Amino acid sequence: VPPATVQALADLHAAGLHVVPITGRPVGWSVPFASAWAVDAIVAENGSVALVQGGVQSQIGRQPSPDGRFVLSKLYQQDTATRQANHARMQQVAQRIVREVPGATASTDSVGRETDIAIDHSEFAHLPPAQIAEVVRIMQSEGMNATVSSIHINGWYGSHHKLDGARWI
């Protein structure tokens, strides 16, 4: 993330605004940024999970713990049982995509994902439009939502999306 962007977030926060970046990146990728940046929360994985400063679900804000460190809480749009079932299904879909679509690979940040899967199409790999469309078709045929970002094809179960995540938190 460019330093000018991080500074802009800090300036907004210093001006008294609630700052909540929204990303398609995984929650695992977001943890160091949520801890270091002057933000109230980060919504990750296309709106399904939030890292909230302060450790209290109903409160947004950077609130230190008694020892002075900032505490992060993970909040999810889906309950634990639903997330676990969806995660298992999504891993099967990801394996199918890698098997059936030539050149398809899981994104390098897949390890930190809890509520979606991501197939790389332009970050480190290059998939032509026909193969991107095939990945989307497979995800949708498995009942998943699918979206194509500038670098990944993301798939997930549930009705959430980035705008929904912004409104939720």
Language-model regions, residue ranges each:
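Active-site phosphate-binding/coordination module
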Residues: 3-109
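Conserved acidic, metal-coordinating active-site core of Asp-based
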Residues: 92-169
